[in-house]
Every structure is written in structure tokens, then in C-alpha cells.
Amino acid sequence: SLLHLLDERIATQSKLIEELESLIKGLRVRLVQIEKGNIVHLNEIASIYQPQTISSTELTEDGFLVYGANGIIGKYKDYNHKTEQICITCRGNTCGMVNYTKPMSWITGNAMVINTDEHLNDVCKRYLFHYLSAYNFNCIISGSGQPQIVRTPLEKLEITLPSILEQEQKAMILDMIQAKIEINNRVLSLYQEQKQYLLRQMFI
């Protein structure tokens, strides 16, 4: 039946996404554990800061994307970053989650911005994003009630940087896998929507 066929496709698609996510995770971990290059502190290659927070009541129907503790949380009439940025959640249960923002976005104070715009000759932004995505931030998360990351220990994180050319090559490979994951997630969503539609038709 069509329903059975969709179930099979959903299962196959889910397995494929799982394998790709496992692959990118393994490759990112290799960047942190095995990479050879110059060892630098994060504050030597980036400006690290918490931007101004806006309240949820200020969010709008349309406008520029707003990034908070859980990635995109809504839209706002203005932006506080013209270029795309790496940001790390620094408050709450998702503390240590790494996001890569779209250009012209508003980043709130619930995230710490790792701004490498003044170091683009030494740092490939996408490489650093993948590198930090594999980093275990538990060692610098503080606070018993609400977990948080403060700036000082973050500034002292040791990062291994190969040549800019090598960074760009590795980032390109990881970006290709990331793009495949996103495409396959969209396909999975379509299959799931088709299944829901089919189930609704059966019970009308």
C-alpha cells in the first residue's frame, strides 16, 4: 500500500540522515582532537561579546531574523549584525549550542558572539563554526540553578588553526555534508506530511 511505501521511505530517509550526522560529528571531532597547526586562544582570533537583548514582546511578524538561546526565535524590525556570525548559547539548558547566523540578523544577549570579521586573513569562519560545534563546553559551563557560559573562560579556549587554505578546504567538505543533511531533512518532512495527509483522508 501507499502508506507502507511511505513508512519504508521515512525509515530509509531517517537512517540516511542519521549516518550523515554521525559522519559530520566524527569529522568535526577530528578537527579538535587530531588537527595540526598553530594553537591560539579564541580571543586572539575573535571579538567575543554578548549583544543587547530584546524582549519577546518586541518581536515582529516580519523583518530580520532574531537568534536567541535556541537558535532562531522570531523576527525584529532591525538587525545588530550585518555579516553572518558564529554564536554560542550562553544561558539555559541549551548552553554551549553553536549557531551560524544569517547575514543581517539580530543576536540577543542569550548568545555569545564569536566575531572573526577582523581576522578573516587568518580564520575561515565556517571552519571555526565546525570546530566549535565539536567542542565540549561542559568544562566552562558554570551556575548550579541556570547553566551559563561567561566570557573569560571562553576567551581562553585553545583553538588549533591550520593554514587558511586548509581551513577553507576542510570547511567546504563539512559544508557539503551539512547541505546534504538539510536537503534530506526537507525530503523527510515531505514524506511525513504526505503520510499525515494520507492518514487524514483514510479517516474522513
Language model features with spans:
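A short, aromatic/hydrophobic, helix- or strand-capping loop or linear motif
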Residues: 56-59, 140-142, 185-189
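Amphipathic alpha-helical coiled-coil/heptad-repeat segments
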Residues: 1-40, 158-204
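Short, functionally important structural connectors and interaction interfaces within domains
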Residues: 29, 46, 51, 59, ...
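Non-catalytic DNA-recognition/assembly elements of restriction-modification systems
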Residues: 19-23, 30-68
